[in-house]
Amino acid sequence: MAPRPKGTSAGPKLYEERRLELGQSFQDGGEHYDRVRPGYPADSADWLLPEGARDAADIGAGTGKFAALLVERGLAVSAVDPSTDMLTQLRKTHPQVIALEGTAEATGLADSAFDVVSVAQAWHWCDPLAASTEIARILRPGGVIGLIWNQLDTSVPWVHRLSRIMHAGDVHKPDFRPVVGPEFAGLESHVTHWEDPVTPADILELVKSRSYYLRANDPTRAKVMGNLQWYLFEHLGHTEGEVVPLPYLTQSWRAWKA
């Protein structure tokens, strides 16, 4: 995401407008997003879930990448996303999930109905305080909020440069700590390092699912693709069809309803 504009009065307003503008870039392209975006490691869900959890809500669910892990663990899952296109894809791949249009700030879900609420790869599009209030409303007493991000592992030098070319704005700084509202306590984190086996063509398609690329004009898109092709094929020497282990880390956060 673009850095927060500096300033006193104009800055927050401009940042909010930019956040909403970038978020709109995911309204379409559910099939492509589902095909090219990675899933999440199993232990990110295992660590997140409270003992005895039965009912889960996945907010900003997209095409159901994280919801799939919840279903595999036997939970009844309700998924909420503002994109009709994303939910259409989710219903195709996970018909057992209840899929509803809504946002983290207005889910439309019932009071005190869930043991855990997950927000994977989406909290940065939300108003964290308003979303915290809404999520606390739908959680049962002692319920857990989980915030999950997949990001490229930029501690690996070649991946760091790749992320710069991709304009991967979701790579967090080491001191990153998400904002949650006063409804929650005991915020703690968990990190999983893993690799996704991909081809250079997969990486090129992955870039096309990023908000920076989706909102860019044609000349900017062409420049990004040209730089990326040079980096993968000429600088790194990869070939078409070669399987490349792409290092990721998944950063998970959880807190309990106070």
Where on the chain are the PLM-derived regions?
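Conserved Class I S-adenosyl-L-methionine
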Residues: 3, 179, 183-258
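Conserved catalytic/acceptor-binding region of the Class I
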Residues: 133-198
